[in-house]
Regions:
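Cytosolic covalent-transfer regions centered on His/Cys nucleophiles
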Residues: 1-179
């Protein structure tokens, strides 16, 4: 039974990774360029030194969206349950988890938030991965979801990953990261 579950997890992770990789490659061919500030507002970005656990990181990252009414508490719980049930497939780029739940799980509008951690946290309960950032993707309208997924392309760029790890990075610096 455990072997079957591991195979299921591996297939799910591999197919999701392939889908994201295909998206990122197609996005790199586009002419229009964007910055993080095009997708996340300054009040939805947080920088912390440390976080005790991956589920706490998701809760903290989501808190600005919850306060504004963009998402409900159950959306946060469903994101945490998705990691518990499906593993770390949401870590699309090195050390960054792009967490989300379903369109019927308490999302009111497309939104996004980012939590940057100075000290990485271990993400997931199995297939654990080290992360330094959590990006919350609140996708209510599937037709517009590719706009939010552009964040993965921007944050996945090597120079942007290096910048995120600099000790003196500010919210303004994060907003200016671009593709």
């Amino acid at each position: 039974q455990k072997d079957l579950e591991q195979i299921r997890q591996k297939l799910y992770h591999d197919s999701y990774s392939l889908m994201c990789s295909t998206f990122l490659k197609s996005y790199s061919l586009q002419v229009d360029r964007h910055c993080i500030g095009s997708y996340i507002s300054p009040q939805d970005i947080q920088i912390l030194d440390v976080c005790d656990s991956w589920n706490e990181a998701i809760r903290i990252a989501s808190s600005p969206l919850l306060k504004k009414g963009d998402i409900e508490q159950r959306y946060i719980e469903e994101m945490i349950n998705a990691v518990r049930n499906y593993g770390t497939y949401m870590v699309l780029t090195p050390e960054i988890a792009y967490v989300h739940a379903g369109v019927n799980d308490g999302i009111h509008r497309n939104c996004s938030a980012l939590l940057l951690l100075k000290k990485p946290v271990i993400f997931g309960n199995f297939n654990k991965k080290k992360i330094c950032a959590v990006v919350v993707l609140g996708i209510n309208n599937r037709k517009e979801d590719s706009d939010l997924l552009n964040l993965a392309y921007i944050l996945g760029k090597e120079e942007n990953l290096k910048r995120l790890k600099e000790k003196d990075i500010t919210i303004k610096d994060i907003l200016e990261l671009h593709d």
